[in-house]
Amino acid sequence: SINVSPINIEEAPILKPYLDLCQNLGKFGGQIIESNIKEINITFKGSVSKINTKPLISSLIASILSTKMESINLINAEVVAKQKNIEIITSFQDQTESHDSEISINLITEKEKFNFSGALFAGSSRIISINGMRIEAEISKNMLYTSNTDKPGFIGALGTELGNAEVNIATFNLGRTGSGEAVSLIEVDGKINSELIKKLENISNVKSIKKLSF
């Protein structure tokens, strides 16, 4: 049997924005990874570490797995993870570097590691870090994720291809390291088709391009 912690009336208003954040973070990570998950490592930092995190953990697991399989929900998520031999590790830290609360996830799959963090800003979900790169990106309905070598010309070429396809950029958020790696999260108006993704993958210095929906 699964131990899903019930949400009482008093804590519901506190948990609601965090449940939304966890759902968005789970969908984000699940859409990025490409191979079977072996481990989901979740760290709650700051104020969120002191509240009832059981439903948040279930929400994260359910959202990650639901991008790859059907009929996953808050009730059965941890059971399914166990059946799939996915190890769930949770940890808690009282302090955060720059936010009141932060949730960090490290996904380990058969072929890759992907870590990212999120936080709430005025009740809305934001991605604040991807693979150690700081970024500030509000999660929206249709987005594009890019990973690339940080060289001149990439952003211009990307913008040109999107413009040619009549895809409008609403927001553009960039994260980068000092060692030549960069990621971006781009909010776009409307959905991006697979044909356009193939064109974007041919841009110089691209490592990965993913269309995201939330």
Question: What do the PLM-derived regions correspond to, one by one?
Answer:
Residues 1-214:
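A conserved regulatory-domain signal marking ACT and ACT-like small-molecule sensing domains
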